[in-house]
Amino acid sequence: RICATGFELLRQAGEQLRDGVELALCVGAESMSRNPIAAYTHRDGFRLGASVDFKDFLWEALYDPAPGLDMIATAENLARRHGLSREAVDTYALNSHEQALQTQTSGWFADEIVAVRNESFELDGYQPRGITLPRRVDAVTLDSHIRPTDFLALATLRAIHAGGVQTAGNSCAVVDGAA
């Protein structure tokens, strides 16, 4: 799973507490920017010059093979089922954007955010690993997805699927996160 792992952990902890566990610690992290890419066609090697079929796990994880739908199509089906108009979805998204911006601006979660910095991790016998931020970025201290918007900006965005209600402005972002 790649979405809502923090919420899933809270749900599981709640079940365990209900069943008698005295203490539950929930930690979740999602690194969408470092999602792996795999090659499944290399078991017998590659022919020189032959193309290699790579599969992006991110897009695979955003697609549910049981009904044959991606996450946006699932959201569109739910919008149709519950009679949600584009205007209603954009209004809800605007409210969410405004609350997130107000919370970030007020510093409500400032004590809970740990800055991510360029860092190297080394252990004898292993290759060094690390975190490398873009040039001229010393640290990431805020959620980069939260930014001001208005209803007109949301309303002018093109729907992802023709005739649908989901847009880049009212859908969940594909970002790194932790809970």
Q: Where in this protein do the model-derived segments appear?
A:
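Conserved catalytic cysteine-centered active-site region
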Residues: 1-23, 65-71, 147-173
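Charged, low-complexity, helix/coiled-coil-prone segments
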Residues: 19-45, 124-126, 159-175
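Active-site-proximal alpha-helical scaffold in enzymes
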Residues: 1-30, 79-109, 177
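Short amphipathic alpha-helical segments at helix-loop
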Residues: 56-60, 77-85, 163-167
